[in-house]
Structures are given as C-alpha cells and as structure tokens.
Amino acid sequence: AAAPEWRDLRPHRRARVLYRIGDLIEEHADDLAALQTADTGKTLAETRALALSAAGTFRYTAAALETAEEAITPSRGPYLTMSTYEAIGVVGAINPWNSPIASDAQKVAPALGGGNAVLLKPAEWTPLVSLAFGRLVHRVLAEEGLPTALLAVLPGKGRVVGDAIVRHPLVGRIGFTGGTATGRAIARAAADKLVPASLELGGKSPTIVREDADLEQALAGVMYGIFSSSGQSCIAGSRLFVHRSLYDSFVGELVERVRELRVGPGTDPGTQVAPLVHHAHRDAVA
C-alpha cells in the first residue's frame, strides 16, 4: 500500500510536490531529451517537446488537486451523504517505447496525485529516460521527507516484469499503453483480480480532406500526422482520404513535399525524419 505519510497528505500538499517535480523535469529537459533521442532515435526537437509535455502534465495534475472537491448529496433525511476520494494503494503503469517520458508522466502524475504508490515499467527498448525521470521524482520526494519507494521504475521484459506487476495481488489498478493483444491479456488478468484497468491500445487514424479544406493547413497536418516520430505512433495518420475533386493535385503536392524531407540522425538539428526505434522495424519497412 502507499505510505500513510503520502496517502494522508491533504491534496494541496501533494500538489506542491507535483509542481516541484514538473519544475525539475523542465530544468532537466535537455538532458532528458538527449537520453530519449539516444533510446528512441527521435529528433531532439521532438524529445525536448515531450519532456516539456511531461512537466506540463505534473503541473496540470497539481492544479486539479488544488481545486478538487468532494460532493455532498442533498439530504433526504436526518443524515449526511457525501462522496470522498480514497487512494487505491499501488498502481501499475506499463508504457510503450515511442514516447516514454510523456507516457510516464501521464500515468505517474495522476496516480501519485491520488495518494498512491506507482510501479512503472518502461518498454524494454527504451528504459533510459524513464530511469532518469524516476531519479528526478526520487529527488523531490527525498527533499520533502517522503519515501522514494512511492515510485519504483522496473525495466525488463514485458512477459516477466509486466506480467508480475499485472498479477500481483497488491496492485489495485493497472494502466497500460501498447498493443491490442497485450491489452486483452491485461484486461483478462485485471478481471480475474477484480481491479480496474485503463487501456490505451493501437488503432488506425484516418485523415479526411474535404472539398472545402484549407489545403495548406491540410498538407501540413498530413505531413506532421504521419512523419512525426517517424510514423511510430498509435495516433499517426496512417490512412488518407481526399475528396476526388482535390485528389490529383493534393497527392501530387504531398509527394513532392515527402521527397524533400531530410532523413538523418535524431541528434542533427536539420533532421526531419529520424531513425526507427529498432532494427526489426527497419527491416519490416525495408
């Protein structure tokens, strides 16, 4: 279970800790970006933006804590009915390789904010930035006199570490982002324990260009939607539907812009399309 000294803190006090974590992430955004680029191949511009997004997630959660309210239901008799929030205890968070620090913050910030402890499993291919993120969180917790064990970062294989987290009897909620088949298995395991699971799984994201579209904006959106993160995203615009009256001119211009994209290492400021995360993906595309 989560440490009582954290669980029992008033929400505005927990908010202060989350604000400090967000500030520290922003202070170390360049270092976190470099680690994530080394791990994922993404451009430094992308990885720095993801680090800043993570900082923003902690601040957003902190602000929500400061304004949290517990509802009192209108009385229908000589009694008082109210809703209160209680910590779950231990939350398991299992994340993908494509945007690690942003995904980490999206799960860890709300879980910590709710007074819980978190077991964070980063993807096997991209653990470095998650480990660095964990050290920053530990630094803040230690400064506040709180147990650093409120966040444990557990890298390793999904079938070993992930399965242990999902099936552990003390894990009271599971958050997973990743493939649909794995998500189904996690949902079944969570159902066996009667604990909730939040699943963000794979999908296809079509872009639809209507006859009355702003073509310049549409072209820019299509390019960004499929080539950001080198297309390695569950929200990548992997299908394109263009109105027949625009089709030839739109696709022709799109092809010309694609030909002008600069492919290179993520550390090169001029790179627009960076390497794929793993040689298996490279071989599949090639």
Model-derived segments and their meaning:
Residues A1-A68:
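Glycine-rich loop-to-alpha-helix module at the N-terminal edge of alpha/beta enzyme cores
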Residues E5, D23-D30, G41, A63-E66, ...:
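Generic secondary-structure signature for well-ordered alpha-helical cores
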Residues W6, L24, T43, S99-P100, ...:
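Glycine-/small-residue-rich active-site loops that bind phosphorylated ligands and cofactors
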Residues A15-G22, A33, A51, A55, ...:
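Hydrophobic face of alpha-helices
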Residues L35-T43, I72-P78, D268-A274:
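Short linear capping/connector segments at secondary-structure termini
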Residues T37, E70-Q217:
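Rossmann-like NAD(P) dinucleotide-binding subdomain of oxidoreductase/dehydrogenase enzymes
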Residues A181-A286:
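ALDH superfamily catalytic-core signature
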